[in-house]
């Protein structure tokens, strides 16, 4: 079973990317579980046909700890299983603790004992800190993919996340599998993201063109099954195949901020 975490800057498209690429893997016959690690609880909505899912933390607050697995785990497109960690009540507690609580509960309820090929963690966080680092810190995720674009904050976040991976690589065994460029129509962005990937010792595993990016439709089925060939769906199917066949897993070499800014200036991102 491969355990994969998807990180990246807030709003970069982690949840859309995760759900579409897992749908592609599901169409390949892979058995998958998505664990949403974001208080917004939108990591499984598309694969569940647009339906909101009750979160683990909400369920625990309302029903206590004596719950069954199917109370918090739902099955959607291509047999993909989905769980949402959720978050604390607004203004109270730490959202990162919700990830720790949720993964612990899933382990106790036997979710990881199923015949799974992949577990994907869709993780909130521009920086890898606290509970949001749990999939990395505790060795739950062995491979990380960072969704980014050729913009300063997207690449700054990617470099920060690489620092977190590097920090926990020896204790947790986690490795970076590559950068996924979610295009924002920036001039020369494939070259820039590839340059940054090379600089930190990894690869740009796939480039999703801006004209191919999926808008948030109500369901994955409509996204992956109703388009002509070589459209959005095929981009994510290609990404799924690349991740399934990927064998490049590295301990990244994060850059200093000065080095990152120098590269951005070379590419005209900073004046």
UniProtKB/Swiss-Prot annotation:
One GO BP: nitrogen fixation
ADP-ribosylarginine carried by residues: 97
Cofactor remark: Binds 1 [4Fe-4S] cluster per dimer.
Cofactor field: [4Fe-4S] cluster
Disulfide-bonded cysteines: none
Top EC category: oxidoreductase
Name the record gives this protein: Nitrogenase iron protein
NCBIfam families per UniProt: nifH
């Amino acid at each position: 079973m491969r355990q994969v975490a998807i990180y990246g800057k807030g709003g970069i498209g982690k949840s859309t990317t995760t759900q579409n690429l897992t749908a592609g893997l599901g169409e390949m016959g892979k058995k998958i579980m998505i664990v949403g690690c974001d208080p917004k609880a939108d990591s499984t909505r598309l694969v569940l046909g647009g339906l909101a899912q009750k979160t683990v933390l909400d369920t625990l607050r309302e029903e206590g700890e004596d719950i069954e697995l199917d109370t918090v785990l739902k099955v959607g497109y291509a047999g993909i299983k989905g769980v949402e960690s959720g978050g604390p009540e607004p203004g109270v507690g730490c959202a990162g603790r919700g990830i720790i609580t949720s993964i612990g509960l899933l382990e106790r309820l036997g979710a990881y004992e199923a015949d799974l090929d992949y577990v994907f963690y869709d993780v909130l966080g521009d920086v890898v800190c606290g509970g949001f680092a749990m999939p990395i810190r505790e060795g739950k995720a062995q491979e990380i993919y960072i969704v980014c674009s050729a913009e300063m904050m997207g690449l700054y976040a990617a470099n920060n996340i690489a620092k977190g991976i590097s920090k926990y690589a020896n204790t947790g065994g986690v490795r970076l599998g590559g950068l996924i460029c979610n295009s924002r129509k920036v001039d020369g962005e494939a070259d820039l993201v590839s340059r940054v990937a090379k600089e930190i010792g990894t690869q740009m595993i796939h480039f999703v063109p801006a004209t191919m990016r999926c808008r948030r439709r109500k369901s994955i089925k409509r996204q992956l099954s109703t388009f002509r060939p070589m459209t959005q769906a095929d981009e994510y199917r290609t990404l799924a195949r690349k991740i399934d066949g990927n064998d490049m897993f590295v301990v990244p070499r994060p850059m200093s901020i000065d080095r990152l800014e120098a590269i951005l200036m070379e590419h005209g991102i900073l004046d």
